[in-house]
Amino acid sequence: NSRVSADDDVYIVGDFCYWSGRTPDWYLRQLKGHKHLIIGNHDKATLDCENAAKYLESVEKMQHVTAEDKQICLCHYPLAEWYKSRHGSWLIYGHIHGARDEVYEFMKTRERALNAGACINNYTPVSFNELVRNNKAFQEKDS
């Protein structure tokens, strides 16, 4: 909450509060900002929680936004191509967390694809520019 204001848009790229001892609405009601959930494969508890919806501005499988003058596709899953990917748009995805497997190796070749995994971003909300820096730092550990 110290990094998010009440007016900020916060995009959760799936797997919200997975393996948690509390209900999703318990977390959502405490978090600042306009929260948008991009559905992940571990979001059944959030989707089934009746009270969670009142804390979410949107719930989508995929969303396209413009932020900081950039076209961005948000999807829980890493994609080989995405909306306007050949025209300079960015992809922000989750799902693979901090894995360094063949999917990770492939996604490193996608110039404007960013892993929003919490483990890559110090388990804290980040801006677009911080996401870029954190992905670069994570990839530099491969060298």
Give names to the regions the model predicted.
Residues 1-62:
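Core catalytic region of metal-dependent phosphoesterases/phosphodiesterases
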Residues 52-142:
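Conserved beta-sheet core of the metallophosphoesterase superfamily
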